Amino acid sequence: MKPPDNSFTDDRLLGGRVHIRQPASGYRVAIDPVLLAAAVPAKAGQQILDAGCGTGAALFCLAARVPGLNLTGLERQALLAEYAQAGVALNGLAASARIVTGDLAQRATGPFDIVMTNPPFADSGTPPPDGSRAGAHMESDIDLRGWIGHCLAVLKPKGRLVLIHRAERLSDILSALADRAGDIHIRPIYGKAGQPARRVIVDAGKDRRTPDTLLPGLVLHADDGAFTPAADAILRAGQALL
């Protein structure tokens, strides 16, 4: 009998509704892709791209909330793309989702109604020793401005870009969107009430000029460390964050 493959684990999100396959060590899914998926204003029939999809967690969470989407995941790391492709089968999405292995600058095609993305978040410092984590966490040949530019380029006119990133990069995000997008909705994500925001979710409309909106923030944890009811509704029940 063939021994079990211990290089990956099969796990669940959204209270068991979503299956993901991911490396047993190195890059592991956190809550960012789940929050990202909850913030995507998708409708059945739309074309959706997840740029840098990793193992597909955000795509699969979005599909669980909004049936009938046409989903594309783009991932440059072949191993993560392989796990994402396995996730397509595990979630019964073979007819509506595809995973493309390649670089955002070279392999992204469109046009898409919505591009969702959780870009590499660190622009400097020492990369993690694990290759999959380094690729997911560190900007490489495409910096944040370039990443956003490529995402906007494959959007339909008036299409929307939705991204999650570290709160301290908000000024860089808004600078990259300037003169190329508007109707920008900014939602801070707080670890606990009274703390500085840890993440921001930014939803921008390509070629729009509507003024920006600062939305109410989401607090993830109560003082005792448990998820707040609002966070629990998203992370376990799969509710939208719109």
State what each model feature region is.
Residues K2-A42:
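Class I SAM-dependent transferase core
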Residues H19, N70, S96-R98, G182-H185:
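Conserved beta-strand segments of alpha/beta enzyme cores
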Residues S25, I142-G191, Q195-A197:
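Conserved Class I SAM-dependent methyltransferase catalytic core
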Residues A39-T117, D123-P129:
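Conserved SAM/SAH cofactor-binding pocket of Class I
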Residues P119-G146, H150-A153:
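Mobile active-site "lid"/loop adjacent to the S-adenosyl-L-methionine
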